[in-house]
A protein has these predicted regions:
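Glycine/threonine-rich beta-strand-loop-alpha-helix active-site module
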Residues: 76-174
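C-terminal catalytic subdomain
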Residues: 250-323
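C-terminal charged capping/lid subdomain of soluble metabolic enzymes
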Residues: 300-381
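ATP/NTP phosphate-donor binding region
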Residues: 1-92
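Flexible, glycine/charged-enriched surface loops at secondary-structure junctions
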Residues: 202-211, 225-235, 250-255, 308-312, ...
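Carboxylate- and glycine-rich phosphate/diphosphate-binding segment that chelates Mg2+/Mn2+
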Residues: 151-250
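Short alpha-helical scaffolding segments that buttress acidic/His motifs in well-ordered protein cores
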Residues: 192-196, 236-244, 259, 278, ...
């Protein structure tokens, strides 16, 4: 392993995963010196709130349940939650749901650790470095990995602080639902992109790389299960939780930034753009970092295929293996188009997307971003 001259890594996230993982929450609350959590739930009525409450059984731990976090919560919602937290004597926060619920929980944690105004007055996207309350996250639907990360979006503002990461992520198969059509595939590709781009980044973090390898292997080893969507939920949830840790300790790569820029410039969804762009961006990065690309073949293809591939061919095999994995994860129903052109992205929109992505310091210049987009538009390997 090549060690950089300087790197940093931070993660407070403990993961409890598997059958009856929910029943460990009262124990973890006690370890955090918390006695009454406020549990935030989405507006869906799918039985997850009842399953969650039942897991507390005879633990003697009271919970305050708030059902109905809206799809786009605002500061009025935050003040309502802050008042409920204060009036009911809560001392911890649990997010039960997906990305919106996790973001609301992070915003509330900033507010209850100080005042609601602290969130509105936060500058530079970074909340005050106060010690926040215990925060647990229990996924029920596929997210994008940001749920366990240091990032949050609330009230059309973005926030970033390592203190926003949950203290505990609880992955219990009883709670997991597939969500909207295409959501599971989008979640798995998002986790894969975070991991792959962290492994190919110019300043590679060896600890982030270890987490990234686990994310990739979880997805690769369960690619067959992805065709039976319910069987893929637990591996995907674990991969997403770990990818949030990777995301917090890495810089988003060109595929992620170009996909976001392209979705802002054209009607294509960010998830579809990312699925098309990732192999092309990975091939581009492989030319810059061939040794890292060769190493990346190991988690993508597995030990047997890696050892059978001659050392001099491993870097070149990485991007095709990545493309194959994305197709396997998507399955026939969610398979992405073969190219941006096939996805009806106007070719004339590519320069604007490249400019937008370059402004966000993607590590690829405007010209390099346009090269990646052009290859993805034609579908050239």
């Amino acid at each position: 392993m090549n060690m950089p001259d300087l790197f940093s890594f931070q993660s407070p996230v403990k993961i409890e995963s598997g059958r009856r993982a929910l029943e460990n929450i009262p124990i973890e609350l006690a370890r955090s010196e918390a006695r009454k959590p406020l549990v935030l739930c989405g507006s869906q009525r799918d039985g997850t709130a009842e399953q969650f409450a039942a897991a507390f059984g005879d633990s003697g731990v009271p919970i305050v349940l708030y059902e109905g976090i809206p799809a786009d919560p605002d500061f009025m919602t935050l003040r309502e939650l802050w008042g409920l937290y204060r009036d009911r004597g809560c001392d911890a926060i649990i997010a039960l749901g997906g990305g919106t619920t996790a973001d609301a929980a992070k915003a509330l944690n900033i507010a209850v650790s100080g005042r609601p105004e602290d969130l509105e007055q936060a500058t530079g996207g970074s909340p005050a470095a106060a010690r926040l309350r215990p925060f647990f996250y229990c996924p029920t639907t596929p997210g994008d990995g940001r749920e366990t990360s240091c990032f949050a979006r609330f009230g059309k503002r973005d926030f970033s602080s390592m203190s926003l990461m949950p203290n505990l992520a609880v992955i219990d198969p009883r709670l997991l639902r597939e969500g909207a059509p295409g959501a599971l595939t989008a979640a798995m590709v998002e986790a894969l992109a975070t991991a792959v781009e962290a492994r190919l980044a110019p300043a590679r973090n060896p600890l982030s790389g270890l987490y990234a390898d686990v994310v990739i292997r979880l997805l690769a080893e369960n690619a067959a299960a992805a065709k039976k969507r319910a069987a893929a939920l637990a591996p995907a949830a674990n991969a997403l939780c770990l990818s949030g840790v990777v995301l917090s300790n890495a810089v988003r790569g060109p595929a992620s930034r170009l996909a976001a820029a392209l979705s802002a410039e054209t009607p294509i969804s960010e998830a579809t753009a990312l699925a098309i762009l990732l192999p092309h961006a990975a091939a581009f990065l492989a030319k810059r970092h061939p040794a890292a690309a060769a190493d990346l073949l190991l988690p993508l293809a597995g030990a047997d295929a890696f050892t059978r591939t001659p050392a001099g061919e491993r870097a070149a095999r990485m991007a095709p293996q990545l493309r194959s994995l994305i197709r396997n994860l998507a399955g026939a129903a969610d398979a992405p188009p073969s190219s941006l052109g096939a996805a009806a992205v106007p070719k004339e929109a590519l320069p604007a997307a490249a400019r937008r992505a370059a402004l966000d310091a993607s590590g690829a210049s405007e010209a390099e971003g346009l090269e990646i987009l052009s290859l993805a538009w034609t579908g050239t390997p």
